[in-house]
Amino acid sequence: MVHPLKDKVVLDLGIGTGCLAFRSLELSPPKLLVGIDFSATGLCVAKNISKQSKFQQYECDMILGDLEKLPIANRSVDAIISQATLNLLPDKCGALREISRIAKSGARIGISDAFRTSNKSSDDESWEQCIAGAITVSEFSQLCLSVGLFIAGQVDLTQQVRMLVADKKWDWPEFLEHNMDYRAFLLVRS
């Protein structure tokens, strides 16, 4: 999803500590980077990183907020990124509707997350392990279309994630235990 972002507004939904957002700054600095998360602790880390000499030249705004009720103006964002966040939200349709609302026409939206491989609902899996809230790729596709977001591309990262977990480079055994998929999607707002 790396396109020239000069003079663009980029939003990281579920910024956490900012790993993805700050990597994007290194690749293609935008006019403004906005990070939103419901975790004050993660945002505190992201704010501190944004003040480091490496990033202090960039305009960064970190907001404590609800991803299902974004405090962002309509049609004001050029690019949106989100990693491993959607499956943690109870109202995925509401979050995608908000993404569609704030995205400019033609905005690029990159979302990567874990997905279930079947429609079987979760029973006792915890939300912290990113299992209980996961939906299928088909359900995700339908939700996107219902709010005016179109899938322009997707990459299946399942095998890469499985290898990282098996090699103990990613502490997420539940991913293997529940036979999850991991996908990255490029969405475009109509």
Language-model regions: role of each:
Residues 132-148:
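Short alpha-helix
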Residues 11, 17-69:
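Class I SAM-dependent methyltransferase SAM/SAH-binding core
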Residues 1-9, 23:
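Conserved alpha-helix/loop element of class I SAM-dependent methyltransferases that forms part
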Residues 93-108:
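A short glycine-rich, Lys/Arg-flanked "PGG" loop and its adjoining helix->strand segment in the class I
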Residues 79-90:
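A short SAM/SAH-binding and catalytic strip from SAM-dependent methyltransferases
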